[in-house]
Amino acid sequence: MAIHLYKTSTPSTRNGSVDSKVKSNPRNNLIYGQHHCGKGRNARGIITAGHRGGGHKRLYRKIDFRRNEKDISGRIVTIEYDPNRNAYICLIHYGDGEKRYILHPRGAIIGDTVVSGTEVPISMGNALPLTDMPLGTAIHNVEITLGRGGQLARAAGAVAKLIAKEGKSATLRLPSGEVRLISKNCSATVGQVGNVGVNQKRLGRAGSKCWLGKRPVVRGVVMNPVDHPHGGGEGRAPIGRKKPATPWGYPALGRRSRKRKKYSDSLILRRRK
């Protein structure tokens, strides 16, 4: 990713940076509108995900996570910005005339060829089942359920690693550090997701974050008691509790949020860090 630093002409541009090369020019048959009305609320209008709302209008890009164009080579025509994710996307023109978007693999350039199938080369951007990959292969867009499409390691810079194969299962090390079992028949894409330096981009001002649909963050200790367990008191008061809590009174900072007795507990060999 080519990051362009602004000249220091104003306080906001002094600390700002933008991506200077990747643009967005989506195809009409691969996009559709989506209605944003929740703004972090549930069906009753109660905030369940904080600091969300507003933002620029978006058109959703149809991403091919299944990669079911088997044994048909495709050429990367464009590399585009997607407002719905922090990774870039590639427009692929397949030999049979099909056109689809896929996640941009790191290092892929316009003109490269990608293909999916069972007996394809182990090269960047190709999709194939885990059973046909050698151990130590770096992969992304990994399926959990056969035929459902990739669900793991899809964010910018994400990469998983195939570390073992035994019986009907393959062992993967995920970006979170979790080690789990997945069926060897599930497919994945070779390589790492692009836009690795997304965390190096500085927005520079509050307005840029508003365009992304992110609202300001307010500390609970400066709120009223009716709004947060940390609120209230005279002046700068401590939280008044032994341990910090969420706005709903649950323990914060380290409390495990995964549901107990999930079906996939037996597939996780080592929980995430």
Swiss-Prot record:
Disulfide bonds: none
Stretches for region Disordered: 1-26, 223-273
Keywords: Chloroplast, Plastid, Ribonucleoprotein, Ribosomal protein
Gene Ontology MF annotations: rRNA binding; structural constituent of ribosome; transferase activity
GO cellular component: chloroplast; mitochondrial large ribosomal subunit
Record bears the keyword Iron-sulfur: no
Domain of life: Eukaryota
PROSITE patterns named in the record: RIBOSOMAL_L2
Coiled-coil segments on the chain, per record: none
Biased composition (Polar residues): 7-26
HAMAP family, A to Z: Ribosomal_uL2_B
Name of this chain's protein: Large ribosomal subunit protein uL2cz/uL2cy
Source organism: Ceratophyllum demersum (Rigid hornwort)
Encoding gene (name): rpl2-A
